[in-house]
Amino acid sequence: MTDVFSQAQHQLDALGLRCPEPVMMVRKTVRKMADGETLLIIADDPATTRDIPSFCEFMDHTLIASDTSKTPYQYLLKKGR
């Protein structure tokens, strides 16, 4: 079985950062990516469990997968739909 998170083209380490920094860093990173590229976000701020999915929906990106069952949390985002 392939780990979906290992397929990311880009990675963002947001460990130790607190709201709103993780989402601000995600936005800055995604701006530099091409449509269809993927980003693995690793974070430990509990607010990201709400903020990352909301960011994806608001900005029209796709949240391919997330694992918030334990820290660090992992999110796999695809730029665009």
UniProtKB/Swiss-Prot annotation:
Lineage: Bacteria, Pseudomonadati, Pseudomonadota, Gammaproteobacteria, Alteromonadales
PANTHER family reported for this sequence: SULFUR CARRIER PROTEIN TUSA (PTHR33279:SF2), SULFUR CARRIER PROTEIN YEDF-RELATED (PTHR33279)
Example of a GO biological process term: tRNA wobble position uridine thiolation
Organism name: Shewanella denitrificans (strain OS217 / ATCC BAA-1090 / DSM 15013)
Free-text function comment from the UniProt entry: Sulfur carrier protein which probably makes part of a sulfur-relay system.
Coiled-coil boundaries: none
One Pfam family matching this protein: TusA
Residues annotated as catalytic: 19 (cysteine persulfide intermediate)
Bridged cysteine pairs (disulfide): none
Family of the protein in this entry: Belongs to the sulfur carrier protein TusA family.
HAMAP family: Thiourid_synth_A
Protein's gene: tusA
Localization, UniProt: Cytoplasm
Keywords: Cytoplasm
Signal peptide: none
Listed GO CC annotations: cytoplasm
Chief place of localization: cytoplasm
The keyword Cytoplasm belongs to this UniProt entry's keyword annotation: yes
Molecular-function annotations in GO: sulfur carrier activity
UniProt protein name: Sulfur carrier protein TusA
